[in-house]
Amino acid sequence: MILKKEKQKAIIVGGSIGGLSCAKALILAGWDVVVLEKSHAPPMGSPTGAGLGLDTLAQEIIQSWLSQPELLHRVTLPLTIDQNLATDGAKKVSWVLTRDENLNFRVAHWTDLHGLLYNALPNEIFQWGHLYLSSCISDDKTFVKVKAKVLQTDEIVEVDGDLLVAADGSRSSVRQCLLPDVKLRYSGYCAWRGVLDFSECENSETIVGIRKAYPDLGNCLYMDLGSRTHSTLTELMYKRLNWIWFVNQPEPELKGNSVTMKVSNDMIRTMHREADKVWVPELAGLVKETKDPFVNIIYDCDPVEQIVWDRVVLIGEAAHPTTPHCGRSTNMSILDAAVLGKCLDKWWGADENNSNLQSALEEYQSIRLPVTSKQVLHSRKVGRIKQGLRLLPDRQPFDPKAANSPEDWQDLQQRNIPHFADVPSILDSMFCST
């Protein structure tokens, strides 16, 4: 008879959606987990964050993790349609370039999805206000030791575990230690972002106008392509509108470890004036009415060749920082977590040597790395197309006003990303009916 080993312990660095997804997947695989997160408490209300799209596979994975799968639909709206528009800023008119009525995404606010996953986990696994400092693997490679600072007291604590999971985002401290020569690549543009709560002004001129200009809001991912710029627009649950506007500019000076940049009132006023020039009046009005817009600096990273080391594994943006144009960031993190959990469940048996763990990590890497590498590069390409940046020296930048054949816009649709609908076979058991 083969007996399962006693529970192993994973230390997860990062308490965002990727970290929470890993926690759930590993608990279901029979592991104990502890989550180290530098934030002092779980996010409440609406912190700096915005809308995110969930593809069909990510939806199914999340629902398999919930005791009440229907809860996902209570905090999301459907995105059945993926529509790309060309906009002439001078004439203030838009027209359809592409329309896919079978996207089958759902859209959530970051806070709502985070709360859904957080409430599906035991409270005791979280160590809030803990800043990751360093880690090392024991000489005999039987455990990993993590050092963290308790931010409230400045105390340095050590945590031992069998596996370190780095889910600490695109500027991952864990990745920096393992791959010091790997640097983030500035995309050439930043993104203004905002969420407008219209729950108390549903009949305002702004909301009536935006619904007339974008009649499929509540079921559509709108992309507006202007001259060397583009924007996205979606409706979120609880009467909120989420917009993003990508602007070509030199790389800003980054302060701290966040890709979110503080903005001044002067910057906001300048942005409002530009919106009037670039977009149709309805979209410009929405942008101007949104309180507390913020700026994300857009980075990605050339694909790496390795995301596992002995007892350390990278997931999500820590493994493959990506631009946001193909809706991959959250979806890749969720799929990374699900695959890692299933690989550990498959390989962690009765054998007392480390071969089981290594086999699990190697299979995780072999499944995910080829896919994420292609998707990161495709998203980079799509971003450069939409921003009117050169792809090749002999290829002219994309001009949406001059696009008049399917070859001109085939890369714009979400479903044309590599491996768009692929489901790793190791996940088959998650969706088998009982």
Predicted features along the sequence, with ranges:
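C-terminal helical "tail/cap" subdomain of flavin- and related membrane-associated enzymes
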Residues: I2-Q8, L28, L72-R74, Q83-V93, ...
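Active-site-adjacent segment of FAD-dependent monooxygenases/related oxidoreductases
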Residues: P42-A120, G129-H130, K386-Q387, L392-P393, ...
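Short glycine-/acidic-enriched loop or helix-start segments at secondary-structure transitions
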Residues: C22, G45, I137-S138, V174-C177, ...
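Residues at the starts of beta-strands that form the adenosine-phosphate
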Residues: K9, D32, R240-W243
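Conserved FAD-binding catalytic core of PHBH/FMO-like flavoproteins
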Residues: H73, Q83, N104, A108, ...
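Conserved mid-domain beta->alpha element of the FAD-binding
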Residues: I12-D32, L36-S39, V165-D168, W192, ...
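Short, flexible helix/strand-to-coil boundary loops that buttress conserved ligand/catalytic motifs
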Residues: S46-P47, W65-L66, V75-T76, C177-L178, ...
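Accessory recognition modules or surfaces
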Residues: M1-I12, I17-G18, K38, P42-L57
